[in-house]
A protein has these predicted regions:
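Short secondary-structure boundary/capping elements
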Residues: 39-42, 66-67
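Cofactor-binding loop segments of dinucleotide-utilizing enzymes, especially the Rossmann-like FAD-
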Residues: 8-9, 38, 90
Length: 147
């Protein structure tokens, strides 16, 4: 059984719901999912021991939430090179944050990223069955790459 960390922040609760549903998908695929708010992670040592990392942030003003920017500086110190990664987030008008996080994980952290790329979900779809199922599918797809 592989262990996946889902680290996120959320202002309205939508990205948190996405994190929970992605974790459900990971568990459905037979792996362990641990969910943490990024504000609870205080050191790079807390990022060790996982096989994959899925980071989530809502998009505000075409960018990730400020706490995610701070977290990425911490995560860079954790030396996640070669680990599997993914990124997700909710949005109202534009969904740029997950792609920015994804690119940082790929090009700065040198992580192996999920084949699906980053995952965006319009806030209005987070509370409907199809949206939550899409989140579960994203979690399952990450597990397919974990083996």
């Amino acid at each position: 059984m592989k262990k996946v960390l889902i680290a996120y922040d959320s202002r309205t609760g939508k990205t948190e719901k996405m994190a929970d549903s992605i974790a459900e998908g990971i568990r459905m695929a037979g792996h362990e999912a641990e969910i943490k708010k990024i504000t609870q992670i205080k050191s790079e040592a807390e990022l060790q021991g996982y096989d994959a990392y899925v980071l989530g942030s809502p998009t505000y003003h075409r960018d990730m939430i400020g706490t995610m920017k701070t977290f990425l500086f911490l995560a860079q110190k954790a030396k996640l090179e070669g680990k599997l990664g993914g990124a997700f987030g909710s949005y109202t008008h534009s969904g740029d944050a997950p792609a920015i996080i994804f690119d940082t994980m790929k090009h700065v952290f040198k992580m192996k990223m999920t084949d699906l790329g980053s995952f965006n979900l319009k806030e209005a779809l987070v509370d409907v069955t199809e949206g939550l199922r899409a989140c579960q599918d994203y979690g399952k797809s990450i597990c397919e790459q974990l083996g």
